Design a protein with these regions (language model features):
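Sec-dependent N-terminal signal peptides
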Residues: 3-14
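Charge-biased low-complexity segments
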Residues: 19-216
Length: 216
């Protein structure tokens, strides 16, 4: 009888051990660099802080310690608040923008991210003439849901944003060498597969306020 009880206890302990999930891999656990499988190198900053910055090591303007200054094409720097407030623009095709986010995240990931505070912001450097995003920078919440996504994920994300997203900017911005854009994604407004029939109202909301716009 004692042997039976002991065997049962061992079996229960083994079952409990087998059911214990392994902790998610944190690819951004320390400052420095990480590499995607295609060789693209990303700089990581703020690994011990609530927000981690991930940016392509080849970025010139959208770096972890980049200057927020903007410059005219003739080399003069914008000096006044009025000048910076005159710079304006927005993502041209919200459907394309939202489609990328829908493709990059599964429904399960979206549901999990809806419960987190500011899990993802995307900064970019925009060519005012073409509206092309020249550079992309990610600011992720220091959550396992984000830090467990490998460098290849952010590489694919970056490539799609550069290839598929364009900005419309005002005439004042077209006088500049480059400008900065910022998207703070609200996952509660990103539709699940079952909610795709509501995508147009959601897109209108995504284009309001701080979620999509410029930053200086």
């Amino acid at each position: 009888m004692k042997r039976t009880i002991l065997l049962l206890s061992l079996l229960l302990a083994a079952a409990a051990y087998a059911q214990t999930p392994e902790p998610a891999v944190n690819y951004y656990a320390k400052d420095g660099t990480v590499s995607a499988t295609d060789g693209t190198v990303y700089c990581v900053d703020g690994a011990d802080s609530p927000t981690i910055t991930i940016c392509n090591a080849e970025n010139r303007y959208s770096t972890v310690d980049a200057s927020p200054s903007l410059y005219y094409k003739d080399g003069r720097r914008l000096e006044t608040v009025e000048e910076y407030e005159s710079v304006n623009g927005a993502v041209a095709d919200q459907e394309a923008f939202t489609r990328i986010f829908r493709d990059m995240f599964t429904d399960e990931q979206i549901v999990a991210l809806r419960n987190l505070r500011l899990p993802l912001a995307v900064g970019c450097t925009v060519d005012p003439e073409t509206g092309v995003q020249l550079e992309v920078k990610f600011a992720i919440g220091n959550y396992p849901e984000m830090t467990s996504l490998p460098p290849d994920f952010y590489r694919t994300f970056e490539k799609r944003l550069k290839e598929e997203v364009r900005w419309n900017v005002n005439d004042f911005a077209k006088q500049l060498k480059y400008m900065f854009g910022l998207t703070v994604l609200n996952f509660r407004k990103l539709p699940l597969t079952s909610e795709l029939h509501q995508i147009k109202p959601g897109l209108e909301e995504i284009n309001q306020g701080e979620e999509v716009g410029l930053h200086h």
